[in-house]
Amino acid sequence: MSDPQNYGKQPKDPNKPMKERMLAGELYRIDNVLEQEQDLTAKWLARLNDSSCSSRSERQQIIRERIGAMGEGCDIRPPFYCDYGSNIFMGKDVILNFNCCILDVVTVTIGDGTLFGPNVQIYPADHPRDKETRLEGWEFGRPIKIGKNVWIGGGAMILPGVTIGDDAIIG
């Protein structure tokens, strides 16, 4: 679990694996492990995004292969984009409309009954403010939590570290 005190900081253990750093919201760089996971996700996304003519149940089977958690009645309407998929946790009856992008370098939690309009962008990924650190390829993330029964209108952008309460309307 990420600790807000550590967002964007180097971990105390310099040998901590990059994936653990990433998930903790600490500074990390893409290494071979993360690159391989991104490659697997890219292949999964190609299958998911080719499934637009498939039935909803077939698409849900594909979605469940990679998404961290998905309650009953959820759907992602292709095309869909994400970094890993495994850090996205959706409650039940969540609908992500066309062209949603989630940069899930840390957890993105979406509550029951939440609806995304087309072109919604969820961006927990962040970058150091210090130019030298940023140019060395370091990055970090801050989790996003979206409550229950939220409606995020088309084209809305949610930035790192945001929490949206239950029943909110954004957009």
Where are these regions (language model features)?
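Short, electropositive, low-hydrophobicity segments enriched in small/polar residues
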Residues: R29, M157, I169
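C-terminal/domain-terminus segments
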Residues: I164-G171
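Terminal amphipathic alpha-helical/low-complexity segments used for targeting or macromolecular assembly
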Residues: M1-G73
